[in-house]
Amino acid sequence: MTATAPITQDVRTFPRKLPDGPVNLIGLTRDGLRAALIEAGTPEKQAKMRTGQIWQWLYQKGVRDFASMTNLSKDYRAMLAETFVADVPEVVSRQVSADGTRKYLVRIAGGHEVEVVYIPEVDRGTLCISSQVGCTLTCSFCHTGTQKLVRNLTAGEIIGQVMLARDDLDEWVPTGEGSDAKPRLVSNIVLMGMGEPLYNFENVRDAMKIAMDPEGISLSRRRITLSTSGVVPEIAKTAQEIGCQLAVSFHATTDDVRDKLVPINKRWPIADLLDALRDYPRVSNSERITFEYVMLKDVNDSDADARRLVQLIKGIPAKINLIPFNEWPGAPYERSDWARIEAFADIIYKAGYASPIRTPRGEDIMAACGQLKSATERARKSRKQIEAEAGL
């Protein structure tokens, strides 16, 4: 990431319709689904009702076989099967950590792969999903940043990660039962996987609106957290159009250090970022912003850093998540000593901010924060190759 990078990255997103193939309904907005049904011959007067019926099959019951959508006529189901598909990304491999964390390697159109992580806890289940193949930000402490950006994910590929996890966890509502028939295993979504979500804003927005829709997956916006490295111009739009919880990959208290750790800081330095964050809780009706802070030995973990951090965020409803650095092969940093992390947390706590220390999860399967990178990373492809695969 350089200081001259554009706000909207020049990265292709695969179309929902592959060459000479059917339209994939997964990822279409309600309006998009209705329009697709009308184009396929559904009378306009029936389109709203049909949209609602299909929506509930797809996103409440997890049924993607049109023949099983039994409240639709046989002829209508046959038309759907001839015209559309309802496909989610393919799970290539599934690893389960000793602590119960699950990591999925997922294949999408073009043969590219991303990673998805499910973290079970006593009172919640958090699904960490990706928004891009690779990443453009090159944050020096993050393994994902060493995998070059290939492309944005479509809305279908983003919400599809949620759906495949629910498949694996057997979380869908059985036909004939209410939406509260089963305990919710995926209770929270965090956009903290591969990629910068705000460089793929429209697709992330559409996918999260599907996740929040009350007739489908029905997650509260308070249970969805979008993590950004600080794409300042998109922060207000996130509050207005998504309204989810916001986390910021902060990681440093001076521009000199943050320029090295999070190079996007060269374009939007700390002062500009904090200015953009001050209005977010009010506009989005969120309780507070989460500041993520990775603890790097002798880099950003001094008492002076802790005191500066408290001063910087003064006046912003916030909590600070302290993240012990999760090492990966070739990493240029070390994790701060535990005593140092606790001392740092104590300074923040005494200043009146919650400062939980994140327990590393899934380290044995490289599923912890900052460790994600496609294990079978493909050879980099040229734009011409990507366009050819997409039928552009």
Curated annotation (Swiss-Prot):
Subcellular location: Cytoplasm
Entry binding sites for S-adenosyl-L-methionine: G195, E196, S227, S249, F250, H251, N326
Pfam family, one: RlmN_N
Disulphides: C128-C369
Active site: E115 (proton acceptor), C369 (s-methylcysteine intermediate)
Gene Ontology MF term list: 4 iron, 4 sulfur cluster binding; metal ion binding; rRNA (adenine(2503)-C2-)-methyltransferase activity; rRNA binding; tRNA (adenine(37)-C2)-methyltransferase activity; tRNA binding
Keywords noted in UniProt: 4Fe-4S, Cytoplasm, Disulfide bond, Iron, Iron-sulfur, Metal-binding, Methyltransferase, rRNA processing, S-adenosyl-L-methionine, Transferase, tRNA processing
Cofactor(s) needed for function: [4Fe-4S] cluster
Biological process terms in GO annotation: rRNA base methylation; tRNA methylation
Signal peptide range: none
Annotated Radical SAM core domain residues: 121-358
SUPFAM superfamilies in the record: Radical SAM enzymes
InterPro entries in alphabetical order: Aldolase_TIM (IPR013785), Methyltransferase_A (IPR040072), RlmN_N (IPR048641), RNA_MTrfase_RlmN (IPR027492), rRNA_lsu_MTrfase_RlmN/Cfr (IPR004383), rSAM (IPR007197)
Top-level EC class: transferase
Function of the protein: Specifically methylates position 2 of adenine 2503 in 23S rRNA and position 2 of adenine 37 in tRNAs. m2A2503 modification seems to play a crucial role in the proofreading step occurring at the peptidyl transferase center and thus would serve to optimize ribosomal fidelity.
Similarity section: Belongs to the radical SAM superfamily. RlmN family.
UniProt cross-references to NCBIfam families, sorted A to Z: rRNA_mod_RlmN (TIGR00048)
Other remarks in the entry: Reaction proceeds by a ping-pong mechanism involving intermediate methylation of a conserved cysteine residue.
PANTHER family reported in the protein's UniProt record: 23S RRNA METHYLTRANSFERASE, RADICAL SAM CORE DOMAIN-CONTAINING PROTEIN
Protein's UniProt name: Dual-specificity RNA methyltransferase RlmN
The species this protein was found in: Jannaschia sp. (strain CCS1)
Organism taxonomic ancestry: Bacteria, Pseudomonadati, Pseudomonadota, Alphaproteobacteria, Rhodobacterales
